[in-house]
Amino acid sequence: MKTLLLTLVVVTIVCLDLGYTRRCFNHPSSQPQTNKSCPPGENSCYNKQWRDHRGTITERGCGCPTVKPGIKLTCCQSEDCNN
């Protein structure tokens, strides 16, 4: 009985993922979609866009950085929300 209880506790911890971290897209403009787990405590994702001689450039990642004027920044707080 104790073994069954211990097994249920372990399964619950694994399923609940108590060490939960945010997941954000991190692929550049023209690359296939990829995402990564953010560092613990980082609860937002960003999508940063600007134009240069190559066209519109997009950068994605974890956090919500400060940007220079002329750069469009969108920050969000859900899974893979920065595409």
From Swiss-Prot:
**Where does it primarily localize?**
secreted
Name the record gives this protein: Short neurotoxin OKI-01/OKI-19
Physiological role: Binds to muscle nicotinic acetylcholine receptor (nAChR) and inhibit acetylcholine from binding to the receptor, thereby impairing neuromuscular transmission.
Q: What CDD domains does its record include?
A: TFP_snake_toxin
Task: Report the transmembrane regions from the record.
Answer: none
**GO CC term, one of those recorded:** extracellular region
Free-text tissue specificity from the UniProt record: Expressed by the venom gland.
- Matching InterPro entries, A to Z? Snake_3FTx (IPR003571), Snake_toxin-like_sf (IPR045860), Snake_toxin_con_site (IPR018354), Toxin_cobra-type (IPR054131)
Signal sequence range = 1-21
Q: Which family does it belong to?
A: Belongs to the three-finger toxin family. Short-chain subfamily. Type I alpha-neurotoxin sub-subfamily.
Q: Where in the cell is it found?
A: Secreted
